């Protein structure tokens, strides 16, 4: 695999040890804005967390609207760790920029204010909100997804992951909240704060190839007994709007929930336990618990295929309206991990309980919620019978009409983040 270099990093790979102003500052080709907060008028704050917020802003000279993500890195106990994570997210976004990836939000610039202790990202404003809130609204309105609609959205997720993985990146936090809906109704994969650059792109069975092994030194949970409401939970399972969990719409999710400190039960997470050891390769404990692959939970080597486990969990929820590994709003993170560890029996029970579902959907769920060595990658998934009738070339070129297209009144319309 060729080393992936970014414009501001001439002689190194992504993820340096201690980012500073010189290496954090970035500006995309053709962007006319300046690298300072005074160049932007804040229109609205659409989300906030314990150490960050997301605003909609208008750049003063061009009058263009953007999403601005702010991370207050002095608000946490391990400042350098936050800096590393912030730069990792920035680097993943720049890689997507360089590849002209239309399935990721474009990063226009990033800069740091060391005096105030703030990281800034100026990004494309994805105005349709997050996929989780859209799913919840549909369920509230009694509009269950048809299999054709599910097929469309899962196919778009496959394409999002295929592109991301082709750059040698793992996402590691694939969930409905981190999928955005653009103005045309297509899915965009966001929040790269948990992303990881792989060692190389070789390997069989869809794996990247070599993976590093380090001791498990962290736990995702804020505490073993902490109560967690699934981001897709309503009653005994199902979709819940993102802004019910401490953030408005997708502001705390698709534009970067992890790096804003949002927790599922409105309790700020233990930042050190959440982010410790962010650069240790494939055994670091990163991701949203109910979507984490079993190999991640168990702390063994993992690859890009961990993202397809998450895809399988999302597919199950779209088909059934139920969260696969979350039994109730009182389910603890520790219990979720236990459920994932016992996934074979739980999956069989859940599938039987939620019949009828098509054989094709059940088959794809079972292929994704499976041991890593048997799990398909994007090229294999695209051949699955579930996607019969899908024209992948047309999908890749955004030529297939989405089931839903946002109705927007202006370039700064934030209605999908407040309703």
Swiss-Prot record:
Domain AGC-kinase C-terminal: 388-419
Enzyme Commission number(s): 2.7.11.1
GO molecular function, one term: protein serine/threonine kinase activity
Pfam families for this protein: Pkinase
Active site residues of this protein: 173 (proton acceptor)
One GO-annotated biological process of the protein: intracellular signal transduction
Keywords in alphabetical order: ATP-binding, Kinase, Nucleotide-binding, Serine/threonine-protein kinase, Transferase
N-terminal signal peptide: none
InterPro entries: AGC-kinase_C, Kinase-like_dom_sf, Prot_kinase_dom, Protein_kinase_ATP_BS, Ser/Thr_kinase_AS, Ser_Thr_kinase_AGC
Key word ATP-binding present: yes
Family annotation (SUPFAM superfamilies): Protein kinase-like (PK-like) (SSF56112)
Disulfide bond in keyword set: no
Domain Protein kinase: 40-387
Catalytic activity: L-seryl-[protein] + ATP = O-phospho-L-seryl-[protein] + ADP + H(+); L-threonyl-[protein] + ATP = O-phospho-L-threonyl-[protein] + ADP + H(+)
Residues the entry annotates as binding ATP: 46-54, 69
Family: Belongs to the protein kinase superfamily. AGC Ser/Thr protein kinase family.
Name the record gives this protein: Probable serine/threonine-protein kinase DDB_G0290859
């Amino acid at each position: 695999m060729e080393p992936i270099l970014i414009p501001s990093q001439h002689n190194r790979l992504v993820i340096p040890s201690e980012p500073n102003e010189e290496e954090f500052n970035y500006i995309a080709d053709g962007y006319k804005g300046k690298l300072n907060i005074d160049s932007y008028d804040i229109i609205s704050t659409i989300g906030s967390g314990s150490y960050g917020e997301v605003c909609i802003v208008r750049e003063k000279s061009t009058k263009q609207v953007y999403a601005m993500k702010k991370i207050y890195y002095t608000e946490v106990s391990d400042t350098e760790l936050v800096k590393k994570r912030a730069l990792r997210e920035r680097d993943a976004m720049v890689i997507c920029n360089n590849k002209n990836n239309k399935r990721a939000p474009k990063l226009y610039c990033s800069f740091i204010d060391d005096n105030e202790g703030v990281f800034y990202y100026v990004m494309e404003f994805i105005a349709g909100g997050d996929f989780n809130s859209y799913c919840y609204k549909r369920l509230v309105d009694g509009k269950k997804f048809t299999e054709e609609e599910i097929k469309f959205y899962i196919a778009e997720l496959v394409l999002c992951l295929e592109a991301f993985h082709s750059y040698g990146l793992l996402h590691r936090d694939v969930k409905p909240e981190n999928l955005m809906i653009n103005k045309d109704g297509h899915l965009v994969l966001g929040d790269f704060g948990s992303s990881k650059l792989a060692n190389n792109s070789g390997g069989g069975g869809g794996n990247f190839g070599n993976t590093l092994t380090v001791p498990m030194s962290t736990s995702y949970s804020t505490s073993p007994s902490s109560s967690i409401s699934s981001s897709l939970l309503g009653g005994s399972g199902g979709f819940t709007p993102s802004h019910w969990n401490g953030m408005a719409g997708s502001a705390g999710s698709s534009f970067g929930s992890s790096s804003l400190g949002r927790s599922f039960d409105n309790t700020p997470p233990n930042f050190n336990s959440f982010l410790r050891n962010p650069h240790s390769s494939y055994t670091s404990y990163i991701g949203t618990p109910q979507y984490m692959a079993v190999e991640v939970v168990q702390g063994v080597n993992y690859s890009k295929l961990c993202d397809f486990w998450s895809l399988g969990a999302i597919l199950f929820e779209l088909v059934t309206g139920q969260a696969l590994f979350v039994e109730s709003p009182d389910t603890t993170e520790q219990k979720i991990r236990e459920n994932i560890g016992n996934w074979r029996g739980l999956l069989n029970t859940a599938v039987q309980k939620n019949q009828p579902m098509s054989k094709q959907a059940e088959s794809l769920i079972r292929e994704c919620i499976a041991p890593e060595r048997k799990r398909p990658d994007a090229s294999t998934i695209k051949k699955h019978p579930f996607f019969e009738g899908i024209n992948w070339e047309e999908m890749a070129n955004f030529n297939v009409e989405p089931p839903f297209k946002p109705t927007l009144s202006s370039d700064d319309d934030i209605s999908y983040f407040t309703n």
